[in-house]
Amino acid sequence: MIYLAGGCFWGVEEYFSQVDGVLDAVSGYANGRGDTTNYQLIHQTGHAETVEVAYDANRISLKELLLHFFRIIDPTSLNKQGNDRGSQYRTGIYYTDKADLAIIDEVFKEKAKDYKKKIVVEKAPLKHFIKAEDYHQDYLKKNPNGYCHIDINQATYPVIDESKYPKPSATEIKEKLSADEYRVTQKNETEKAFSNRYWDSFDAGIYVDVVTGEPLFSSKDKFESGCGWPSFSRPISPDVVRYKEDKSFNMTRTEVRSRSGNSHLGHVFTDGPKDQGGLRYCINSLSITFIPKADMEAKGYGYLLSSVE
C-alpha cells in the first residue's frame, strides 16, 4: 500500500485505477491535524487530498507506481496542481513500510535531474488516512465529464525506467556508433529517404535508441506515410521523447530527441492519420535499432510485449 497526494483526488484515483497491477484506489484525506476531517474542513485541518493505492507487487513495483505518479504531477509546484490551489492540493508520498523510503529517495534523486526548480513533494510516514465521502469515490466513472486536471489516458502507456538505459560517455558513443549513426544522432543530420533500413519494414517489435537502448516506438504505431522514413503515430510512452524547436533550413519544425541519450531522432508533424491522433513522427532509421518481438524477452524488453501485441 502506498498513499499518493497529487492535487484533486478525482483524477489521481481514476488514473491509478487504470494502471495494470493496481488492485484498488480509494480517495481520502491524509496527514493533517488529527484523525477526523471531511471535504468541507480539510482546508482548516491541514489534510491533503490523497489516494490510497493497493497494488500487486508481483505485477507492478513501487518504483513503477512512483514513476506513474511523477508523470501526472508538477513536483515543483507548492500547494497547486492544475487549477486547484491550497494546502489540501499539495503533493505528497506517504508510506507505511519504512523499507519503501529507500525506493522513494531513489526516485526523488533521479527526478531531480529533470527539473531546474526544487522538488517540493512531501515524503513522510503516513500518520492517518481518512476515507473520503462516498460521492468522491469513483467520481469520474460516475461523472465522465467531471473536472480533471490530468490526462487519464496516459495511464495506459507503459512506464519506462530511464535509469535502466544510461547514456554512455562521449568516447563510448563514438566507438559504439557507425560514422553515419554518429552524424545523425549527435550532429543532427538526416539520412536519405527511401534508402534507409526501416522505412518499409513493418515486422512486429519495438524500436530503441541506438545509443542507449531505451525503448522509443512500437511497430503497432508504425504506418506507411510515403515520406521515405520510418513513421509512427506516437512514441511507445510519452516519457521517452523530448521536443525542441528547430529553425534550421529556414523552416520552423519540432525536433524529436530521445530522453536518456538526447539523440536526434527526427521531427514530428501534424499530417499523420487522423484516426490515430493526427501526428507523424518522422524518424531516422540510423537513430534507432529494431528489436523483433521474438527477441524482446531475451533482450530485457519483455515488459513491453503488451505494447506490441
From Swiss-Prot:
<dbReference type="Pfam" id="PF01625">
    <property type="entry name" value="PMSR"/>
</dbReference>
<protein>
    <recommendedName>
        <fullName>Peptide methionine sulfoxide reductase MsrA/MsrB</fullName>
        <ecNumber>1.8.4.11</ecNumber>
        <ecNumber>1.8.4.12</ecNumber>
    </recommendedName>
</protein>
<feature type="domain" description="MsrB">
    <location>
        <begin position="170"/>
        <end position="293"/>
    </location>
</feature>
<feature type="region of interest" description="Peptide methionine sulfoxide reductase A">
    <location>
        <begin position="1"/>
        <end position="153"/>
    </location>
</feature>
<comment type="function">
    <text>Has an important function as a repair enzyme for proteins that have been inactivated by oxidation. Catalyzes the reversible oxidation-reduction of methionine sulfoxide in proteins to methionine.</text>
</comment>
<dbReference type="GO" id="GO:0005737">
    <property type="term" value="C:cytoplasm"/>
</dbReference>
<dbReference type="Pfam" id="PF01641">
    <property type="entry name" value="SelR"/>
</dbReference>
<dbReference type="InterPro" id="IPR028427">
    <property type="entry name" value="Met_Sox_Rdtase_MsrB"/>
</dbReference>
<feature type="active site">
    <location>
        <position position="8"/>
    </location>
</feature>
<dbReference type="InterPro" id="IPR036509">
    <property type="entry name" value="Met_Sox_Rdtase_MsrA_sf"/>
</dbReference>
<dbReference type="InterPro" id="IPR002569">
    <property type="entry name" value="Met_Sox_Rdtase_MsrA_dom"/>
</dbReference>
<dbReference type="GO" id="GO:0006979">
    <property type="term" value="P:response to oxidative stress"/>
</dbReference>
<feature type="active site" description="Nucleophile">
    <location>
        <position position="282"/>
    </location>
</feature>
<comment type="similarity">
    <text>In the N-terminal section; belongs to the MsrA Met sulfoxide reductase family.</text>
</comment>
<dbReference type="InterPro" id="IPR011057">
    <property type="entry name" value="Mss4-like_sf"/>
</dbReference>
<dbReference type="InterPro" id="IPR002579">
    <property type="entry name" value="Met_Sox_Rdtase_MsrB_dom"/>
</dbReference>
<dbReference type="GO" id="GO:0033743">
    <property type="term" value="F:peptide-methionine (R)-S-oxide reductase activity"/>
</dbReference>
<keyword id="KW-0560">Oxidoreductase</keyword>
<dbReference type="GO" id="GO:0036211">
    <property type="term" value="P:protein modification process"/>
</dbReference>
<dbReference type="GO" id="GO:0033744">
    <property type="term" value="F:L-methionine:thioredoxin-disulfide S-oxidoreductase activity"/>
</dbReference>
<dbReference type="GO" id="GO:0030091">
    <property type="term" value="P:protein repair"/>
</dbReference>
<keyword id="KW-0511">Multifunctional enzyme</keyword>
<dbReference type="GO" id="GO:0008113">
    <property type="term" value="F:peptide-methionine (S)-S-oxide reductase activity"/>
</dbReference>
<comment type="similarity">
    <text>In the C-terminal section; belongs to the MsrB Met sulfoxide reductase family.</text>
</comment>
